[in-house]
């Protein structure tokens, strides 16, 4: 592990950038979180004791989860400066000696967390933009009929412009979110001064007392309180973009105070106006400022949605490199910032799903039942992995782990029980969506293992010396063959010898490997050797955030091995495999069918690795699994 940004004072620009990317989701929670606790579904009376109790739970939830868990401890668990569920899983698998049983568990944890993140990626844009546009109803109830159409237009526009990248637009995200958080704090402060008794909610006893007074509603209420904590995972996931200190300082200096003040202000307002629970956030503002506030909140929710969409792109790219998803087309939208990527198929799948959610649920209050469960599951998975990190890498004692991590885990499981009670009211959606994603991730991973076993069995029948002793003609030029495993003869090479009976003067086997690190230095990416039959074997190892540069690898090997590459024709031989599902053991038949479909629809290697198509030769190979 490395200490990101250690020894360097955090840049104000990085702190501003963190506001626009890291805290968009957390920052827009005041639009719906506190109001949702007094939804008639929960049968919670608007009394001072209940208001203090709910506020106490929200405020102390912000202290325990974003502040203690993420800002204080989780940010220490960086994988070469990167955070998030896949980097954390890779960190545990690479740095901690675990039995095969526990390694499988960690992989399952990681896949569940990733699957739930995708579920969250569809709900966040829908509920955020809906809740912002609903503010128009404060101006006039008749405007309520425009909520869904306007939301659809905004979301379509947001996803439509993804292919252009977010670099230029992203430069204004930070200042807009700075204005948003200042507005949150100001609106809350005004009403706190009008009703200072609301500060009683700072006492955690009110939260405890709520449990005693509302035992039948406790877990339902916890399932709603979690709405105020959604987005906390981004503090850890976006660590690689901004560093530890900018994220921490933005939280302590602006985000946490602004959120606390706004929630207290909402409590003060409802304490004074017990019947004003509808569109509570917008009622904090004077009537003349409601429209500007709707516009500002819409911008804030679009920014929050953008952060989640970008996160889905990054998650997908990492999943592809780590072998949990098939190759997909990935466009780099900024040559100077390689992390700025666009994945068309993910973008349009997200858009279709988000629009279906908006048109099905139609109100943010209806979507609130679906929200929270996906985020909560990701939080629990992160905590379980962090317990392993604390025990094995930080060398914490059992007592320390019990006091900190087990306590946090118990709280998150209590939230999880509360969210589980919302399954009939929309909570089924993230479970269903996440279940499908988990099935795809697991099926692809398991299918790849099965495919490699079949390839190894087929490969065991051949040896290079025997293949080359069968009257092979040498032809000028360079041939590059891709090997799925080190020390394995590429099947495309075997096919070429068997059908064409030729061997190029310079023949190269190249294997692309992915390390459990986000980035691998260029000096450590290449290993190479010359076999005793004169064939060059190259292993190119890149990080799961890196894009392998084949041209640079070949140029480096040319210098190191004195390969005469210049001026000679080069051909890339690719094996186009057709997967034939069978009823043999290893995986259920329906999973094999799904795997074959995924394999068939993966982006071809020519496009993915940006190979010149006129230099590519494809050889068809059928593989039964």
From Swiss-Prot:
Q: Which reaction does it catalyse?
A: K(+)(in) + H(+)(in) = K(+)(out) + H(+)(out)
Localization recorded for this chain is:
Cell inner membrane
Spell out the coiled coil positions from the record: none
Source domain of life is: Bacteria
| Keyword annotations | Cell inner membrane, Cell membrane, Ion transport, Membrane, Potassium, Potassium transport, Symport, Transmembrane, Transmembrane helix, Transport
The UniProt entry lists the main location of this chain as membrane
Which InterPro entries is this protein grouped with? Answer: K+_transporter (IPR003855), K_trans_C (IPR053952), K_trans_N (IPR053951), Kup (IPR023051)
The annotated topology with respect to the bilayer is: Multi-pass membrane protein
One GO cellular-component annotation of the UniProt record comes to:
plasma membrane
Q: Supply one GO molecular-function term.
A: potassium ion transmembrane transporter activity
Q: Which family does it belong to?
A: Belongs to the HAK/KUP transporter (TC 2.A.72) family.
Q: Quote the protein name from its UniProt record.
A: Probable potassium transport system protein Kup
What gene name is listed for this protein?
A: kup
């Amino acid at each position: 592990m490395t200490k990101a940004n250690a020894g360097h004072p955090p840049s104000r620009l990085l702190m501003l950038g963190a506001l626009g990317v890291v805290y968009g989701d957390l920052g827009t929670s005041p639009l719906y979180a506190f109001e949702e606790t007094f939804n008639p579904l929960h049968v919670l009376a608007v009394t001072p004791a209940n208001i203090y109790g709910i506020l106490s739970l929200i405020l102390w939830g912000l202290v325990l989860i974003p502040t203690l868990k993420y800002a204080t401890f989780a940010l220490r668990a960086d994988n070469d400066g990167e955070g998030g569920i896949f980097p954390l899983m890779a960190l545990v698998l690479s740095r901690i000696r675990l039995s095969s049983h526990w390694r499988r568990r960690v992989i399952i944890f990681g896949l569940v967390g990733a699957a739930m993140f995708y579920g969250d990626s569809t709900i966040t844009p829908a509920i955020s933009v809906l809740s912002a546009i609903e503010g128009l109803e404060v101006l006039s109830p008749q405007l309520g009929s425009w909520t869904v159409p306007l939301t659809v237009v905004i979301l379509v526009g947001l996803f439509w412009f993804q292919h252009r990248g977010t670099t230029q637009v992203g430069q204004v995200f930070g200042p807009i979110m700075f204005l948003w958080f200042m507005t949150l704090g100001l609106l809350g402060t005004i009403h706190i001064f009008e009703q200072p008794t609301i500060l009683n909610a700072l006492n955690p006893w009110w939260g405890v007392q709520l449990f005693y007074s509302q035992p039948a509603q406790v877990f339902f209420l916890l399932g709603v309180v979690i709405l105020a904590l959604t987005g906390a995972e981004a503090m850890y996931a976006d660590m690689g973009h901004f560093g530890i200190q900018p994220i921490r300082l933005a939280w302590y200096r602006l985000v946490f105070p602004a959120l606390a003040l706004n929630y207290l202000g909402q409590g003060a307002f409802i304490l004074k106006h017990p019947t004003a629970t509808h569109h509570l956030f917008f009622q904090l503002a004077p009537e003349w400022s409601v429209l500007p506030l709707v516009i500002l909140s819409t911008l804030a929710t679009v920014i929050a949605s953008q952060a989640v969409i970008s996160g889905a792109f990054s998650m997908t790219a990492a999943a592809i490199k780590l072998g949990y998803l098939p190759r997909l087309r990935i466009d780099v939208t900024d040559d100077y910032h390689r992390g700025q990527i666009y994945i068309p198929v993910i973008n349009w799948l997200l858009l279709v799903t988000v629009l279906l959610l908006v048109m099905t649920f139609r109100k943010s209050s209806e979507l609130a039942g679906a929200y929270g469960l996906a985020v909560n599951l990701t939080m629990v998975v992160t905590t379980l992995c962090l317990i392993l990190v604390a025990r094995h890498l930080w060398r914490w004692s059992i007592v320390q782990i019990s006091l900190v991590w087990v306590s946090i885990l118990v709280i998150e499981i209590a939230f999880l029980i509360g969210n589980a009670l919302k399954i009939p009211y929309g909570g089924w959606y993230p479970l269903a969506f996440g279940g499908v994603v988990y099935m795809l991730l697991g099926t692809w991973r398991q299918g790849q293992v099965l495919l490699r076993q079949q390839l190894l069995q087929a490969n065991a029948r051949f040896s290079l010396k025997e293949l080359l002793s069968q009257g092979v003609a040498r032809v000028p030029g360079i041939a590059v063959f891709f090997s799925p495993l080190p020390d394995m003869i590429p099947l495309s090479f075997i096919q070429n010898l068997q059908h064409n009976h030729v061997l190029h003067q310079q023949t190269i086997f190249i294997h692309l490997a992915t390390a459990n690190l986000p980035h691998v230095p260029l000096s450590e990416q290449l290993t190479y050797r010359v076999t005793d039959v004169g064939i060059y074997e190259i292993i190119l190892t890149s990080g799961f955030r890196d894009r392998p540069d084949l041209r640079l690898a070949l140029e480096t090997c040319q210098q190191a091995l004195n390969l005469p590459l210049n001026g000679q024709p080069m051909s890339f031989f690719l094996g186009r495999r057709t997967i034939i599902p069978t009823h043999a053991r290893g995986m259920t038949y329906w999973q094999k069918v799904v795997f074959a479909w995924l394999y068939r629809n993966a982006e071809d290697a020519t496009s993915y690795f940006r190979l010149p198509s006129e230099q590519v030769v494809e050889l068809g190979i059928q593989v039964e699994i």
